[in-house]
UniProtKB/Swiss-Prot annotation:
Catalytic reaction(s) noted: shikimate + NADP(+) = 3-dehydroshikimate + NADPH + H(+)
Organism lineage: Bacteria, Pseudomonadati, Pseudomonadota, Gammaproteobacteria, Vibrionales
One Gene Ontology term, aspect cellular component: cytosol
Gene3D superfamilies, alphabetized: Leucine Dehydrogenase, chain A, domain 1, NAD(P)-binding Rossmann-like Domain
Annotated positions binding shikimate: 14-16, 61, 86, 102, 215
GO annotation terms (biological process): amino acid biosynthetic process; aromatic amino acid family biosynthetic process; chorismate biosynthetic process; shikimate metabolic process
NCBIfam families xrefs: aroE, PRK00258.1-2
Family: Belongs to the shikimate dehydrogenase family.
Annotated pathway: Metabolic intermediate biosynthesis; chorismate biosynthesis; chorismate from D-erythrose 4-phosphate and phosphoenolpyruvate: step 4/7
UniProt-recorded name of the protein: Shikimate dehydrogenase (NADP(+))
Job description of the protein: Involved in the biosynthesis of the chorismate, which leads to the biosynthesis of aromatic amino acids. Catalyzes the reversible NADPH linked reduction of 3-dehydroshikimate (DHSA) to yield shikimate (SA).
Natural source organism: Aliivibrio salmonicida (strain LFI1238) (Vibrio salmonicida (strain LFI1238))
Length: 273
């Protein structure tokens, strides 16, 4: 039985074991997947022990994604640009490959909702690790532009500079945003504390799609704000969670599981249905 895991701190609430166990059942893959809570200062020891004892691959969540980036022997292009790793795989020659599947998870979720990205104007709110992880996969969908805004403008500017070689990316001060966008993505965790970004609702219009990377029971505060401002549709990040897991599973096993049934199960659990 091949061994996989997710590392984090804390890790008790992780949905990854549930998701990957269902993926394994669906694809008839002989594997086990467990959650491992590494000490805050003990990730490297924990992950080294895991691979030394037959581990095939693992997911990495907060606060260890940057450490996993340093730990990997080899990095995919999307991991290099993300500056963080959420997926590690032990190759046949013993090399540990680091990848980042977060952005692909977001894009796949948007596409399954039939949200058009090509030639669209995208607003990305936030310039932290979550934003950095999704920029390259979003740019590969050929939007007309991606505008990055952040509470600290300099962080948005630095991010736009890194990714401008890959497509039309610009940084704008939050106070200078005066028009609407086709797709608005909130990459901040503000919704978890019931807060909204300090930006004008002019970003929304009747045809806009809102996407909040956070999720919970019912609408997030960001998506409720978007709906109150007449967006066409609003989605949360639960599908991104399942999408990045499906991409990790594909990296490990070479075949892609279906996300739809698992997403339905998770949504039911979340809503207490």
């Amino acid at each position: 039985m091949d061994k996989y895991a997710v590392f984090g701190h804390p890790i008790k609430q992780s949905k990854s074991p549930f998701i990957h166990t269902l993926f394994a059942r669906q694809t008839i893959q002989p594997l086990e997947y467990v959650a491992i809570e590494a000490p805050v200062d003990g990730f490297l020891n924990s992950v080294t022990h895991f691979f030394s004892n037959g581990g095939k691959g693992c997911n990495i969540t907060v606060p260890f994604k940057e450490e996993a980036f340093q730990f990997a022997d080899q990095l995919t292009d999307r991991a290099k640009l993300a500056g963080a790793v959420n997926t590690l795989k032990k190759l046949d020659d013993g090399i540990i490959l680091g990848d980042n599947t977060d952005g692909e998870g977001l894009v796949q979720d948007l596409l399954q909702y039939q949200v058009p990205l090509q030639d669209k104007r995208i607003l990305l709110i936030g310039a932290g690790g979550a934003a950095r992880g999704v920029l390259l996969p979003l740019l590969k969908q050929n939007p007309s532009s991606i505008t990055v805004v952040n509470r600290t403008y300099e962080k948005a500017e630095a991010l736009a500079e890194i990714f401008s070689a890959y497509g039309a990316v610009e940084a704008v001060r939050m106070s200078d945003v005066t028009r609407s966008f086709d797709v608005i993505i909130n990459s901040t965790s503000a919704s978890l504390s019931g807060e909204l970004p300090n930006i004008s609702p002019v970003i929304f219009s009747k045809g806009s799609i809102s996407y909040d990377m956070m999720y919970g029971k019912g609408k997030t505060v960001f998506n409720q704000w978007a709906l109150d401002n007449d967006v066409y549709q609003a989605y949360d990040g639960l599908g991104m969670l399942v999408g990045q897991a499906a991409e990790s599973f594909t990296v490990w096993r070479g075949l892609r599981p279906s996300s739809k049934q698992i997403l339905r199960e998770l949504r039911k659990n979340l809503e207490g249905m």
